[in-house]
């Protein structure tokens, strides 16, 4: 029994080496047709990395031929199935542009956009892929409004937009926590302008006021009055938008301090 198992194992290893040898032989010395047939075989067997190598090898030979449409689609899918999402997005997009009348164009357009979505990193990293994903998904919805993938595309856009909102909010908070209050106020304004319905609105307006407060109280005398008045205006807008905010008890105390500083400035100006 044990001998039989060893024999079977040896056969499997030998077969593996034989298959590997056949692949390398066709890859390096096979005709374009042999490479194409083996690439399709590797693709069907879900050996996508080997399939990609062969497809890349034969692409120049098949450019302009009927098989090229199938090759480009399989290359796109192979990258997608190996989780190389940035490359998959690129190749699916290339397929859509090269074969706009293909029966697979809608599927390819969605998978291009969805690949960008899958390539989108966590909010703390660069969001280039996130922005490209939103644009691609919006383009897909515009071109294929009746597609059954539209609800998924809208859901993906919402998720990606929330990620960009969080990125914008965290950047503004970072300026605030590093005491760069001028930059913080600009960043909070950008967040509120770019994402009108943002769930961060209350906290953003609160932190913008505190940035204005610290900017005013820490200013040199010639800028203090102007900046304190600006902080008071920022607070008025905050209170108008959130009359029941949990932050109001704190901010009203700060407003009282600012009013006292303004009174002191008025006294100094009167004495001069």
Where are the model-predicted features located?
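Acidic, polar-rich low-complexity tracts and alpha-helical solenoid repeat scaffolds
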Residues: 2-8, 16-272
């Amino acid at each position: 029994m044990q001998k039989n198992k060893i024999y079977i194992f040896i056969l499997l290893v030998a077969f593996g080496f034989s298959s590997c040898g056949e692949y390398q032989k066709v890859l390096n010395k096979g005709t374009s047709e042999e490479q194409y047939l083996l690439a399709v075989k590797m693709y069907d067997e879900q050996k996508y990395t080997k399939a990609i190598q062969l497809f890349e090898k034969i692409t120049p030979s098949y450019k302009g031929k009927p098989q090229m449409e199938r090759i480009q689609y399989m290359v796109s899918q192979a990258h997608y199935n190996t989780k190389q999402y940035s490359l998959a997005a690129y190749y699916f997009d290339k397929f859509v542009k090269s074969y706009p009348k293909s029966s697979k164009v809608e599927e390819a357009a969605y998978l291009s956009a969805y690949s960008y979505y899958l390539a989108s990193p966590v909010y703390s990293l660069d969001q280039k892929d996130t922005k490209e994903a939103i644009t691609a998904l919006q383009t897909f919805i515009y071109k294929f409004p009746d597609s059954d993938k539209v609800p998924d595309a809208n859901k993906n856009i919402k998720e990606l937009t929330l990620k960009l909102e969080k990125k914008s909010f965290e950047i503004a908070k970072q300026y605030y926590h590093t005491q760069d209050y001028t930059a913080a106020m600009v960043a909070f304004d950008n967040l509120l302008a770019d994402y009108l319905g943002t769930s961060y609105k209350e906290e953003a307006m609160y932190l913008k006021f505190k940035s204005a407060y610290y900017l005013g109280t820490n200013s040199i005398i010639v800028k203090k009055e102007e900046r304190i008045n600006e902080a008071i205006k920022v607070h008025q807008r905050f209170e108008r938008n959130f009359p029941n905010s949990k932050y109001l008890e704190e901010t009203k105390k700060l407003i009282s301090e600012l009013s006292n500083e303004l009174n002191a400035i008025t006294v100094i100006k009167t004495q001069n």
